[in-house]
């Protein structure tokens, strides 16, 4: 399985068979110019959605008539499951309900994407996510857990590689922090340029990936 960071919380996975999976596709040029990523219109086989906000669940630009997975999917090659969490620390009342964090298993690899998780996770939720080769964790705060909560969560998940997402960039000036507070807490991390990476080639620890649009 290969992974490419597109932008915000959107990732593109490519399986060894050639099938492709988009996680949390966004709608371009939203929020009155504060979310100014360009259109992303991949040809894909699956669109995996953690929750129904426009920066995570826009299907209008996807090509190839993908299967949309909101809860679960299983076939001979691919297994996708969901773990419930709230979008905020107030039982989902502040930022629109819940997210279904995703676990994707294929090609002998296991990846979790936590969507816009906004609450500390229980031991039961951590156990349901299980041990992952890669954990994709939001870090920006305001709409999601903040840097301190994200660092604590990454430590508890203990994935081989943790990839931060959902933070402020030159093209996303929504009210969240940039990656700096999280990276300071991490202490050591690897910064990689935008590319498609085999999951088993990613270094261990915190890995900051450049997205497709921010230099």
Regions inferred by a protein language model and the residue ranges of each:
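Binuclear metal-ion centers of metallo-dependent hydrolases, dominated by the metallo-beta-lactamase
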Residues: 4, 96, 157, 161-215
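Zn-dependent metallo-beta-lactamase
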Residues: 1-17, 27, 34, 79-83, ...
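Pre-active-site segment of Zn-dependent metallo-hydrolases
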Residues: 12-48, 56-70, 84-97, 117-128
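Active-site environment of divalent metal-dependent phosphoester hydrolases
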Residues: 28-32, 52-58, 119-122, 142-146, ...
């Amino acid at each position: 399985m290969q992974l490419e960071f597109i932008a915000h919380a959107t990732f593109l996975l490519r399986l060894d068979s050639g099938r492709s999976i988009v996680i949390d596709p966004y709608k371009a040029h939203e929020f009155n110019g504060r979310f100014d990523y360009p259109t992303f219109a991949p040809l894909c086989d699956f669109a995996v959605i953690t929750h129904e906000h426009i920066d995570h669940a826009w299907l209008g630009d996807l090509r190839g008539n993908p299967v949309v997975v909101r809860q679960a999917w299983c076939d001979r090659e691919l297994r996708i499951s969901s773990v419930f969490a709230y979008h905020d620390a107030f039982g989902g009342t502040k930022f629109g309900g819940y997210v279904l964090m995703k676990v994707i298993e294929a090609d002998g690899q296991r990846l979790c994407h936590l969507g816009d998780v906004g609450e500390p996770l229980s031991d039961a939720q951590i156990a349901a996510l299980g041990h992952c080769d890669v954990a994709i964790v939001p870090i920006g705060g305001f709409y999601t857990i903040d840097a301190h909560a994200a660092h604590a969560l990454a430590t508890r998940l203990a994935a081989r590689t943790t990839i931060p997402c959902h933070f402020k960039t030159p093209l996303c000036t929504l009210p969240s922090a940039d990656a700096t507070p999280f990276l300071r807490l991490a202490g050591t991390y690897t910064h990689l340029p935008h590319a498609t990476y085999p999951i088993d080639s990613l270094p261990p620890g915190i890995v900051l990936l450049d997205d497709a649009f921010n230099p």
